[in-house]
């Protein structure tokens, strides 16, 4: 059995029904376009929505978007842990990160700390593009085993920082 997490008001894992999730393909800082797309996806049955947060403008749009939508919002963070911190301060419902590409352990700890304080779950997303070079070499490329080992290493890192509201996406 998996652990039940709350992404906003939607239960994920732990025997909860499978939730329908999608991701916007708009520029997140184009609030009007992003909100319009979220409303269309919600009308089609989407229960949780994810947006890319590649820069500060996108992070600053999070609270404006949340004011206008009814479903939980996940911020997809790459490379800059400060964007995760900004989104957490702006009321994001969950974060999607790859701890291996947002900086060193102190940066991961900062994200884990704010997420623990604000009850924000973290989705660990691992894919072939983010797979560590050492694991590619160990397994001879991108393999299921390499992806699982990477994800579990990230889980252990977050656990070291007393964080366990984790969803894994491989």
Predicted regions and their residues:
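Alpha/beta enzyme core
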Residues: 2-51, 55-75, 79-170
């Amino acid at each position: 059995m998996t652990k039940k997490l709350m992404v906003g008001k939607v239960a994920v894992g732990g025997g909860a029904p499978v939730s329908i999730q999608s991701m916007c393909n708009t520029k997140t800082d184009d609030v009007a376009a992003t909100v319009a797309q979220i409303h269309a996806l919600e009308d089609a049955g989407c229960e949780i929505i994810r947006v890319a947060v590649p820069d500060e403008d996108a992070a600053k749009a999070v609270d404006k978007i949340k004011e206008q939508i009814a479903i939980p919002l996940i911020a997809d963070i790459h490379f800059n842990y400060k964007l995760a911190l900004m989104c957490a301060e702006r009321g994001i419902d969950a974060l999607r990160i790859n701890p291996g590409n947002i900086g060193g352990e102190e940066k991961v700890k900062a994200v884990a700390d704010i997420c623990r304080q604000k009850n924000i779950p973290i989705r660990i997303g691992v894919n072939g593009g983010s797979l560590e070079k050492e694991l590619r070499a160990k397994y001879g490329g991108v393999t299921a085993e390499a992806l699982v080992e990477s994800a579990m290493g990230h889980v252990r890192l977050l656990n070291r920082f007393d964080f366990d509201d984790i969803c894994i996406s491989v």
